[in-house]
Structures are given as structure tokens and as C-alpha cells.
Amino acid sequence: MGRGAILKFIFSLVWLMAVASPAFAADGQANAGANDPRMNQLYAVGGEQTCLKCHNSPPVNLILQTPMAVKGDLHSPFGQQGCESCHGPSADHAAGKMTPDGKLILPPILFKKPLIEGYDVSPVDKRNEVCLSCHQAGLRMNWQGSEMQKAGVACADCHTSHAAKDPVLVKATQPDKCFTCHAQQRAESFEYSHHPIREGKVVCSDCHNPHGSPAADHLLKEFTVNETCYNCHAEKRGPMLWEHQPVRENCLNCHTPHGSNEAHLMKERMNFLCSSCHSDTSTRNGSGGAFGGRGSIPYHSATGNSAFNSALANPRQCLNCHSQIHGSNSPAGAFFFR
């Protein structure tokens, strides 16, 4: 192909693009208009501006201070159909139309119970469906079938979209939101030994994922209790040369997570907790038990139980010798000595 033929081909291609582009653009605009919900008569003319003519005071208009009101973001409600992105088509409501029995027509999706008598909040599944149409990845991927979902909890029961800062997403206010339902955990947070929740150093979502969890219990962020605890208590992870089996099985064998009146979040006084596995018999006569045949040592006399009774009298007596209770790399580690 000669130089002249190549130039002729390029000129023809440019001419076709110049002619076709306006036609394609016009067709695209026509299709966009047909698919634009604002052209649908079910949606309010003027969008969110129509809504804000009446709903112009807190807490409703506080949504204007949130990322949800960024019109330039096509992933935000205001970048799509505004208020109707979440509340559904509301042209009849905006026009003040009434039902046959004389009641004002409200938007199809109501996240909170209206102040007007005779109306109720929308069903949980309808409300959650709206939220999950955008928020379904990441921490929410296990929502379906989760404990919260099965209990009929709605996203709006915890979250507040019409607020500059959602209380459940702010560390200072998140626990109070959780404690409105979890009263037992709230009471435990005031006990002598507790995780620093009230001090603002730990929040519920540091350990739990309320949207669902792959773990069997407790809506944990990790697969097991221990893996969750090790996120902060990494020094207890191991592996150790000498392992303490109850520790490896589950931290909750000895500790309670939210609060305790015993030191170190222990489930009960340390000496009684130890003796629940290391009984008088097993520690004195070497018959096996928790020590696996290594119980007949000088401190736990086989001729009497005075030493054992002394241990029971002092809450921390066991740790005077067996201080490395989470595991040890010491040559004397079989008994978790110092």
C-alpha cells in the first residue's frame, strides 16, 4: 500500500468518526434519559432539593455533612437519586398525596418509626436490602446467616446515616451503642479488672465483627478466641518449648473477656482456678491427673496436705513458683517455674 493510499485511509477514518460521534452521543443521551430514574414519574421532581424544602432541620439535614451527600461521587446516594436512593421513589409523598383512607403517603422505605401516628418502620429485610445494595463487601461479607441477621437486627438499629459522625464508628461512642443491647457486658466493664473499654483504649469492634464472622461463636474477628487475643497479647502466642495445654486450647478457660472482680480478668480466684484442674489428689500423690504423673514434688507433700492448703489460702500462692503459666522456654519449664 502506497503512501497516498495510507493517507486516504486515515482521512476516511477521521471523517467517519467525526460524522458518527454526534449520532452516537445523541443516542447515548436518549438512552440515558430513558434509564434515568429522575425521568420516572415515581421520583420527585427536583430530587433531594424537593425533600429538603420540608426536611430542613436536624437530624435529617445533618446528612449534608456526610460523605453520603457528595454529589460528585456516583457511589454516594446524592450522586444518584439523592434521598430516594435509600427511601425509594417518593413523588407522591413530595406532592402531598393521600391514601384512600385519608393518610399522607410516606416514602416506601422508613428506617425509623415516624413521629406521625399510624405509621410504622419498614420491615427489617427491606431496610437492610437498601443498605446491602452498596455495603456488602469487606467486613459485611458474612452478614447473611450471621447471629445479628438471624436475630432480626437492622443496620439502622446501630448505624445513623443522618449524622456528621456515625456514633457506632467513633471509638468514644461505639461501646455505649453496643451496651444498649449488651447490658451484661456493660456491667462487667465496671468490674475491678476489665479491658480498658470505658477508658477508650479498646472498643468492641477490636475483637468482634458485628456483621458476621467465620468463627463459631462470639462474632469474633478471627477464627478462634486465641487468635483474637493474640492480636494484642502477642507475647502469649508461642510456640513455647513447654506448653500449658489449657492456654493453648482457649484463653477463656481461665479468663473472662469483659470484666472480672479478680485480677487479670480471671474467672475466679487464681488458686481455686488452678485447683479446678490440679486437684489435691493429683498434686500430692503423683497418680497422674493434671500433672501426668509428675505431681509428687517436695512442695506438694505426699505425707500431708498442709502445703496444698497453704496454696488455697493465698490467692496468688501458685504463681510464687509457677510464674510462667502461659508457657515456658526454661529448662525447668515442665512445671512453668521462673
Briefly describe each language-model feature range.
Residues M1-L7:
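N-terminal secretory signal peptides that target proteins for export/translocation
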Residues P22-R338:
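Short sequence/structural segments immediately N-terminal
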Residues K8-S21:
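Bacterial N-terminal signal peptides
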